[in-house]
Each structure stands twice: as C-alpha cells, then as structure tokens.
C-alpha cells in the first residue's frame, strides 16, 4: 500500500520535475557520457579516433606520471583533516568568549574571499627565493632553512599544500561557527555547573553535535583537493620542478591541450569523476547510518 502511495505522489510531481530533470540531463549527463565514450577511443583534437577498449586506462595505470599525480592529490588531501582539526581548535577558542572574537572570526575568514588565482599569485611572491618568508628566516639567522620552496622537488608540493590549507581554514571555521551558534547554550551552562572545563565541554558536548557539518566539510574538502587544485598548480609551479607537482587535474590539462590526446585525457577525467562520486556516496551512506542510529 505504501509503495502505491509513493508511486502516486511521484506521478503527481513528475510533470513539474520533468523540465529540471531534462535540463540536468542535458547540462550534466550528456557531457559526462561523451567523456566516458571518448575514454574508450584513441581520439585526438583533430581525429575522431577508433575504439580501443581499455587501452587508455591500461596506459594510465602503467604511467609513472599518473601515479605521481595521484600521490600529489593524496598529499593535498591532507589539507582536509588538518583544516578540520585547526578549525575546531579555532572555533573553540573563539566561542570561549575572548574579547573581539567576532573581529578575529572575520579576519580568519578573509583568506577565503579572494579568488584562488589571487591567493596563488600572492604566495608566488611570498614563497619566492627572495620572498618575505626566506627574508624572515635569514633575518632570524636560519639561513640554512631558506630555500626555493616552489622550485625544489622536495618542498614544492608541500608548499602548495600549505597554500591550499591557508585558504581552506577560514571557510571551515565559518561552517563550524554557524553550527556552534545553533547549539543550545544550556548544555554548556549545565556542564559548567558540574565543574567541567570549557575545553572538556567543547570536545565532549559541542563537537559531537557538529558531526554532520564536519562530514560536509570533509566531503567538500576531499573533492576540492582531488578536482579543484588546477589554479594552485598552474600559477605556483606549472607542474614543476621536473613534474614533481603534477596533479590529476593538471595532467588532464596537459594531455588535452598540449599533447592533444583527448582519449587519454578523458580516461583521467573518468577516474577523477569516479573517485569524487565514491567519496560522496560514502558520506551519504554514513549520513543515513547516523540518521537511523
């Protein structure tokens, strides 16, 4: 009976949903389907190409640059747990009741406002050989620590990670602050009456109630670190030195526009799409489990 009732409701709303579904299908489904199709061909920019089956995927799996790019994406994903942990600490300090907390919150959020390209250009100067960071180290007598942060293979990807992390923290603090504002203050008052410290109250009372927003921040961060890092890499390092900062997104760009290998670039795009969908699906599964817990 419930099934028939659900079908009846679906039949009533279908005419209203149809235009939106059709638009989404045209804007999203059709391009995705074409990319998947191209990934099974040896298509180039100027030639339609022939069906080659899984050859492109096999070539990727055997390419050392693909694995290096994937490793770099995983390194950039460290920005997710780090930004969440730092944002939790900052949010706890701000809501401790320090004077001027709103001003500090605004200042922390400011790095998120400029475009990624603007942030990357700023750090291109800050992390340069003669930039403020190295000058500060030299002025402090730590000349041995001064280096080309973006021009040495051993430090370049970690420097990019630092820039990504610096930009993400402000947004994450904003999310957590909004959730904190909706938590019943009587819970904190009751804990204070029981003699609990603010730190203990925050981590044992507030943080558990922020699980949903933490999960949202994690999913968004993972997808960003996996698929939205192109601007950081292309401005800060252009994939160098010696391709040490290639990411999957930058590899896709080079395959598509420099090498004209549309089929191989499409295979990279499909891999990235599947990875993003897997993360999102895992989060949805956790959310459902929490809802029925």
Tell where the protein language model's regions lie, with residue ranges.
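A structural signal for multi-pass alpha-helical bundles of membrane permease subunits
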Residues: 9-293
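Short, Lys/Arg-rich, polar N-terminal cytosolic tail immediately upstream
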Residues: 1-9
């Amino acid at each position: 009976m419930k099934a028939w009732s659900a079908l009846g409701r679906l039949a009533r709303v279908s005419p209203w949903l149809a235009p939106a579904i059709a638009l989404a299908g045209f804007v999203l489904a059709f391009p995705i389907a074409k990319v998947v199709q191209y990934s099974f061909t040896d298509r180039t920019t100027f030639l339609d190409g022939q069906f080659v089956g899984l050859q492109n995927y096999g070539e990727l799996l055997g390419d050392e640059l693909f694995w290096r790019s994937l490793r770099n994406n995983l390194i950039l994903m460290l920005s997710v747990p780090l930004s969440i942990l730092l944002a939790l600490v900052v949010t706890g300090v701000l809501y401790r009741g320090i004077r001027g907390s709103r001003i500090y919150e605004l200042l922390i959020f400011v790095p998120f406002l400029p475009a990624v390209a603007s942030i990357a250009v700023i750090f291109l100067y800050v992390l340069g050989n003669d930039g403020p960071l190295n000058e500060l180290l030299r002025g402090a007598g730590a000349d041995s620590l001064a280096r080309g942060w973006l021009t040495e293979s051993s430090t370049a990807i970690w420097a990019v990670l630092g820039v990504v992390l610096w930009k993400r923290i402000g947004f994450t603090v904003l999310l957590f602050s909004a959730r904190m504002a909706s938590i019943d203050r009587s819970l904190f008052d009751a804990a204070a009456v029981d003699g609990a410290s603010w730190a203990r109250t925050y981590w044992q009372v507030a943080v558990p109630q922020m699980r949903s927003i933490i999960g949202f921040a994690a999913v968004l961060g993972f997808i960003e670190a996996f698929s939205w890092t192109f601007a950081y890499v292309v401005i800060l390092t252009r994939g160098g030195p010696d391709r040490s900062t290639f990411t999957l997104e930058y590899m896709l760009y080079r395959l598509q526009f420099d090498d004209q290998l549309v089929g191989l670039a499409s295979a990279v795009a499909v891999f990235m799409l599947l990875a993003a969908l897997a993360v999102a699906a895992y989060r949805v599964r956790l959310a459902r489990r929490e809802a029925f817990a």
